[in-house]
Amino acid sequence: MAWPAVVLILISAVMHTAWNSIAKKCDTGPAFFAISTGVSVALFIPLMPWCWPLITTLPGEFWTVFVLTVASQTAYFYFLGKGYSCGELSVVYPIARSYPIIVVTAVGFMFGQTPTLPALAGVILVVAGCFLVQMRRFSEWSVRRFLQMASLFALLAACGSAGYSICDKHNMDIMAQANTALAQPVNAAIVPLCYNWLISAPLSLTLFAIALRNPARIRETMRCFRGRAALVGILTFAAYALVLAAMQFVANVSYVVAFRQVSILLTVVVGIFMLGEERNAPKLVGAIVMF
C-alpha cells in the first residue's frame, strides 16, 4: 500500500478513536449522531461552490449506490449507539470495526480482486482477535458470551460499515473519473470532502427522523451533549474524509479497511486505561492480534 495512504489512515485512526471515546461517554442515540452529522454539513457548506460543477455531472449509477451508502451509514451509527449504551467501548468497537473485513474481502473476491496471502492472514488474525476481546478468560468459549446484546448490536453496526465501505469505494472512483472529464477539474484534495458532505446531509436528516420517535431524548441531548456532539461531528467528518482520500491510492478497498484496524488497539487501550473498563488478558491479546 502506498505511503500516502498509510499516513492518511493512521491520522484517521487517531481521530476515529477520539470520537468513539467521546460518544461512548455521552448519550449516543440517533439524536446525538444527528447533531454530529448536522454539524459536519454546516461546517463544510463553503465547499459547495467548488464542488457543485462536479456534483451536477455525476451519473445515475452514482446516485443509486449513494442511496445504499446512506442507508448503510444510518445503520452503522444507529446500532453503534445501541451497542455503546449497553456494552464496553473496548468490546463493541473492535467487533464493529473488524467484522467488515470479512465482507469486504469476500466482495473483492467476487469482483476479481484477489488479496495476497499475507493480506488474507491478516484478515484471519483480525477476526480471531475480535473473538478474544469478548472473552474474560482464555478457557471461556461459551456461545452465550458471544451473543450478548452489545455484541449483536456491534455486528449489525459492522454490516453497515461493510456496506458503506464497498459503496464508497465504487462512488469515489466514479467521482474521480467525472472530475477528470471536467473542463476545470476540482482539486483532488477537495473531492473526498465533497463526497463526505453529500453523505452527511441525508444521513443527518435520516437519523433525526429516527430520533423524532422520542422528542424528550432530543431535548436532553441538546441540553447535555450538544458541545460534545459537535466535536464528534468534526472528528467524524475529518476522519472519514482522510479514509476516502486514502482510497485513491489503492486498488483494493479491503487493504484500507484492514489497515484502519490500528484504531482497534488504540480504542481498547483508551477503554481500559481511560474509561476504567474491564481489563483482562484475552482482551489485551485480542487487541494486539488485531493490530
Give the residues covered by each predicted segment:
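Short, well-ordered amphipathic alpha-helices
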Residues: 169-174, 271
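Specific alpha-helical transmembrane segments that line the substrate/conduction pathway
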Residues: 68-73, 84-130, 197-201, 252-273
